[in-house]
Amino acid sequence: MNTTSNTSNIIVGLSGGVDSSVTAALLKQQGYQVRGVFMQNWENDDNDEYCSIKQDSFDAIAVADIVGIDIDIVNFAAQYKDKVFAYFLQEYSAGRTPNPDVLCNAEIKFKCFLDYAVGQGADTIATGHYARKEARNGVHYLLKGLDRNKDQSYFLYRLKPFQLERAIFPLGGLEKPEVRRLAAEFNLPTAAKKDSTGICFIGERPFREFLQKYLPTDNGKMVTPEGKTIGEHVGLMFYTLGQRKGLGIGGAGEPWFVAAKDLTKNELIVVQGHDHPLLYTRSLVMNDLSFTLPERPKAGRYTCKTRYRMADAPCELCYLDDETAELVFDEPQWAVTPGQSAVLYDVDICLGGGIIQTTDKPVIITR
């Protein structure tokens, strides 16, 4: 339950998409004092056919006009580049696969935007995330969204208690089809707009083309765990563990998957078959821990997601030090990827998590 008085002054993050549009319309309908903010987190290039920022801003302005609220366009591009994009490049250059959307929420949407909103006199910010929040005895709990296919608590796990206290998620108790229906009822121009996909600053452009603009590439061998060369990769950063498509390996038999990266030799290790043992792990070590509650969860049994939309996996949490923890799973987990986030849950409560550093999967190549 989102606990706010309808005398609250709320600023909504309007992205130009259907979810934030309905968020603003619902709050306005419920009698809140509502304003909108469109966050420009990436510098728009008029010659960039893939960048949707300009159209998104037009859509956000049109929504604000129909809902009957004021809207500001605020540029956070410098902060985004410093806090999110630099990290994105650093992780890829180190051979890991980062999730910039997680960092964007913690550093931009619920920090820069929150600071801006408070400076403008807002009591609360609202976003179109599919998540819920409940206050119990003065403590704000982040919960999974009711629509389990759209639940976005995974991307919000790095929010701190002070950020949760000032945020509400009006769509948390709704399912996506209902949101689309409400958008049509409100006559919003975004009612039929396609959901955005991919990393926000990349948009729909080819990932390889984008990354090559910022990081040097180095081709190398594609090898089996036994050391047999079966192809050539175009740069380790373009591949992620568990990847099947785009490997360019033909022949008979089961499909090939990326199992590991050997950064020292610049080799991509691939295995045949979805159920190959090298694609599974029973434990992981995560660092850069972040929790949503005032006190970190005690060591013990929880469930975990190591990627978005996966089923919750039962596990045991053990702290190695203040910034590092180990998770041991009841069952082997497929394609656990360094750089991604491991997020802990106690039933529906999102407790927080950390960045996956290593797994117990052997990476020593036998030759």
From Swiss-Prot:
UniProt keyword annotations, A-Z: ATP-binding, Cytoplasm, Disulfide bond, Nucleotide-binding, RNA-binding, Transferase, tRNA processing, tRNA-binding
Annotated spans, Interaction with target base in tRNA: 99-101
Molecular function in Gene Ontology: ATP binding; tRNA binding; tRNA-uridine 2-sulfurtransferase activity
Pfam families recorded: tRNA_Me_trans (PF03054), tRNA_Me_trans_C (PF20258), tRNA_Me_trans_M (PF20259)
Active site per the UniProt annotation: C104 (nucleophile), C200 (cysteine persulfide intermediate)
Gene3D superfamilies, per database record: Adenine nucleotide alpha hydrolases-like domains, HUPs, Translation factors
Compartments in which it is found: Cytoplasm
Catalytic activity annotation: S-sulfanyl-L-cysteinyl-[protein] + uridine(34) in tRNA + AH2 + ATP = 2-thiouridine(34) in tRNA + L-cysteinyl-[protein] + A + AMP + diphosphate + H(+)
Disulfide bonds: C104-C200
GO biological process, one term: tRNA wobble position uridine thiolation
CC terms in the record's Gene Ontology section: cytoplasm
SUPFAM superfamilies (alphabetical): Adenine nucleotide alpha hydrolases-like (SSF52402)
Positions that bind ATP: G13, L14, S15, G16, G17, V18, D19, S20, M39, G128
Region (Interaction with tRNA): 150-152, 307-308
InterPro entries attached to this UniProt entry: MnmA-like, MnmA-like_C, MnmA-like_central, MnmA-like_central_sf, Rossmann-like_a/b/a_fold
Enzyme Commission numbers on file: 2.8.1.13
Residues of the site described as Interaction with tRNA: H129, Q340
EC class name: transferase
Cell inner membrane recorded as keyword: no
Family to which this protein belongs: Belongs to the MnmA/TRMU family.
Function, in words: Catalyzes the 2-thiolation of uridine at the wobble position (U34) of tRNA, leading to the formation of s(2)U34.
Protein name: tRNA-specific 2-thiouridylase MnmA
Source organism (scientific name): Neisseria gonorrhoeae (strain ATCC 700825 / FA 1090)
Biological classification of the source: Bacteria, Pseudomonadati, Pseudomonadota, Betaproteobacteria, Neisseriales
Gene (UniProt): mnmA
